[in-house]
């Protein structure tokens, strides 16, 4: 059986800077794949390419058998299948929490307002923020804003959720409340691809871990293999630095 998400030989450059140099990666349904690697290794760019926020310069990406990188593909159709959450929240500051969550289901999915709001409230209740439905983002903590950003993505009922360093902009004491949501989504069986610097969390939740360096997947495997028996000098050096920094 073929993977639900296939990334084959994907290349991306910005000017003379090749950020992705031939990425190969597959994700099966219900898997949680964690992308690890130093800053600048291409993790965020890869996620943006999968969501079609960036156009690839080579290779192809396939979702559920359809090549989404072909010319003429409907971007909105792809983003119905593939949600993304950014490290900087990206909530609309002039909209309430409820409006932030319901605007896309109403405009893109054609949901009626009452239906979209009922779904949004159910999601907010699940993450313990129902009382914040009519607040504006600047009235929320960073952790609360990120939880709302995750709910906003979930309101579109994606088949795959991409999470781009979702804790990197948070104070340490707020990280746990966001990671707990990801744990719950894993229990639900949602297919996810996470770029993360939270090595302990990656070890806990990942089905597989992909280590990126200089725009390629240098090593991949189950978390115990990646973190306990790294095979390549690059990964060994990366983990050594992580351990020395007290992050694993």
Language model regions located:
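C-terminal boundary and immediately downstream tail of ABC-type ATPase nucleotide-binding domains
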Residues: 213, 224-248
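ABC family nucleotide-binding domain
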Residues: 3-7, 11-223
């Amino acid at each position: 059986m073929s993977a639900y998400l296939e990334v084959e030989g994907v290349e991306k450059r910005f000017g003379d800077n090749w950020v992705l140099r031939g990425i190969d990666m597959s994700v099966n349904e219900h898997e949680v794949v964690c992308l690890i690697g130093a800053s600048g290794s291409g993790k965020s760019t890869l996620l943006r390419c999968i969501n079609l926020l960036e156009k690839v310069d080579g290779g192809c990406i396939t979702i559920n058998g359809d090549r989404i990188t072909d010319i003429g593909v409907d971007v909105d159709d792809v983003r119905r299948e593939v949600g993304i959450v950014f490290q900087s929240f990206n909530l609309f500051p002039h909209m309430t929490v409820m409006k932030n969550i319901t605007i896309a289901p109403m405009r893109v999915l054609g949901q009626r307002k009452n239906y979209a709001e009922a779904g949004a409230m159910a999601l907010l209740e699940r993450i313990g923020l129902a009382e914040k439905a009519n607040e504006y983002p600047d009235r929320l903590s960073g952790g609360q804003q990120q939880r709302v950003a995750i709910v906003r993505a979930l309101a579109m009922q994606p088949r795959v959720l991409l999470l781009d360093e979702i804790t990197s902009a948070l104070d340490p004491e707020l990280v746990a409340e966001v990671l707990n949501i990801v744990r719950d989504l894993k229990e639900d069986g949602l297919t996810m691809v996470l770029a993360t610097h939270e090595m302990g969390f990656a070890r806990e939740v990942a089905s597989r871990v992909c280590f990126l360096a200089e725009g390629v997947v240098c090593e991949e495997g189950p978390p115990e293999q990646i973190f306990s028996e790294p095979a390549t000098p690059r990964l060994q050096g990366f983990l050594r630095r992580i351990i020395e920094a007290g992050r694993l």
